[in-house]
Design a protein with these regions (language model features):
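Glycine-rich beta-alpha junction loops
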Residues: 23, 94, 111-112, 165-168, ...
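Short acidic/polar active-site loop segments enriched in Thr and Asp
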Residues: 85, 186, 205
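Active-site rim beta-loop-alpha module in soluble metabolic enzymes
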Residues: 123-187, 194, 198, 202
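Glycine-rich phosphate/pyrophosphate-binding loops
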Residues: 202-216
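His/Asp/Glu-rich mid-to-C-terminal helical/loop segments that flank catalytic regions of hydrolases
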Residues: 216-255
Length: 255
């Protein structure tokens, strides 16, 4: 079923996967896993995006910016303008100590807005504790399961777990200990909650997928492996999105 075209936006079928990254380097890695296939450079509102087609299936990749507000705005814009059937937030991230090896892949079963709340003399209170809404969002079970299954089939090192979304990256041991105790997370990044909240508001299944570039805690960028994590993101993209894409993605119900 084709939906009406929007000005400057490619008109696509309902078998349409939206991938949201934060920066262009991550978007390039995702697209590298999708080559060689026909790609169209499209405009999605104010965002430049790339759509890759495989028969009736399409993957649109957009770099929406860093942080929860930017990622939520980008995802919501794309979902308002494109007939997306599923959303994946992709990028690199940090692993909590002992939870995921360097350059391995984490697929979310839950995302948490971990620093959204109030810091008081008695400690940190989450937004839901203050009565202003949930700070946790579950990933779509079928979508997360399909992603993990494809990664494992491709013999990539991957696991599922809780991914924290933060506005300020954790670089102190005291905060690391507090977050680990509160949420038992596997990884930390800056966009997942924003993307999944936008998807939830549109009723579209979503999941976060991260490749590990560093260990959360003391901030020493000399120990990070950004290149390795981006290479792992290429492999993850190839496994999840381009195996090749079937005529109907396994997590998408018929319209």
């Amino acid at each position: 079923m084709d939906l009406p075209a929007h000005p400057g936006v490619l008109s696509l079928t309902t078998e349409h996967l939206l991938v949201v990254t934060s920066v262009e380097e991550e978007a390039t890695a995702v697209l590298s896993g999708l080559t060689p296939r026909a790609a169209d450079h499209v405009t999605v509102g104010p965002y430049a995006a790339t759509s890759v087609r495989d028969g009736p299936s399409t993957v649109t990749v957009v770099a929406g910016g860093v942080g929860p507000p930017a990622s939520a705005a980008a995802a919501a814009t794309a979902l308002a303008l494109l007939p997306c059937s599923a959303v994946v937030n992709c990028g690199i991230g940090g692993a909590f100590p002992g939870k995921a090896p360097p350059c391995s892949i984490v697929v979310s079963d839950m995302v948490v807005a971990a620093d959204l709340g109030a810091q008081t003399d008695d400690g940190f209170e989450t937004l839901d504790a203050l009565g202003f809404g949930p700070v946790t969002l579950d990933a779509d079970t079928a979508l997360a399961g399909a992603c993990l299954e494809r990664l494992v089939t491709a013999k990539l090192q991957a696991r599922r777990g809780t991914i924290l979304t933060v506005s300020t990256i954790t670089g102190r041991q005291s905060r690391l200990a507090a977050l680990a105790s509160r949420w038992d997370p596997v990884a930390e990044a800056m966009e997942g909650y924003g993307v999944l909240l936008a998807a939830a508001n549109f009723g579209v299944p979503a999941v976060e997928l991260r490749t590990m570039s560093n260990v959360v805690g003391h901030r020493d960028v000399t120990t990070w492996d950004v290149t390795g994590a981006l290479d792992a993101l290429v492999q993850a993209s190839r496994a999840v999105f381009a195996s090749p894409l079937p005529q109907r993605l396994p997590w998408i119900a018929s319209p």
